[in-house]
Amino acid sequence: MKILVVLPNFEGGGAERIHVNLANEWAKSGHEVIFCALEKKGPLINLIDQKIKVIDLDCKRILFSLNPLIKNIRAIKPQKIVAAMWPVTTVTILAKLLSGSQSKIFLVEHCAYEKIFAKLLGHSLFSIGLSKTLSYIFANKLISVSNGVENSIKKITILPNKKFKVIYNGIPIPKNLKKNK
């Protein structure tokens, strides 16, 4: 299976690390994994499996990533798309729709959306909720890393419950702790 993972960059945040770990595991399981990063920067690049291709969209602003994402989705033809962190998630949904792709798309939310967080982002909860409601309806699943994150998104959106799934952040198991087969 061909999986496209869309992230803003590879800076040291927990969300980015989880997606690098997941991508590495998918690659080890025989899947073809490709990253599309708005900016190919950050220390986590060094943790990416050599089998994984990393595409640098070279976009300093998220909105400017729309056309490069459309082109890459068309060229790559992934079966699955995984995008993390709003507003990258919303732009990825738009790119998928405009590309004409039949890929299944999964959006991953790592942050609880409260007034103080929205203020830090420079947006109102209303505008965040509206953009999520209008775009996330087209996702196959909206994955939240905790019940708290899921509940915060449900408060600011009008999305059916069947769209939501909580999958807690995984942690990689060190090789010396894995059972021998």
Label every model-predicted segment.
Residues 1-181:
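Membrane-interface segments of envelope glycosyltransferases acting on lipid-linked substrates or membrane lipids
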